[in-house]
Amino acid sequence: STHTSDFLKL
């Protein structure tokens, strides 16, 4: 998880 990157992974 890396904030925005984690969201894109969703």
Curated annotation (Swiss-Prot):
Q: Name one GO cellular component term.
A: extracellular region
| Compartments, as annotated in UniProt | Secreted, Cell wall
Keyword Secreted present in the record's keywords: the answer is: yes
Swiss-Prot/TrEMBL keywords: Cell wall, Secreted
Protein name stated in the entry = 80 kDa cell wall protein
- What lineage does UniProt assign to this protein's organism? Eukaryota, Viridiplantae, Streptophyta, Embryophyta, Tracheophyta
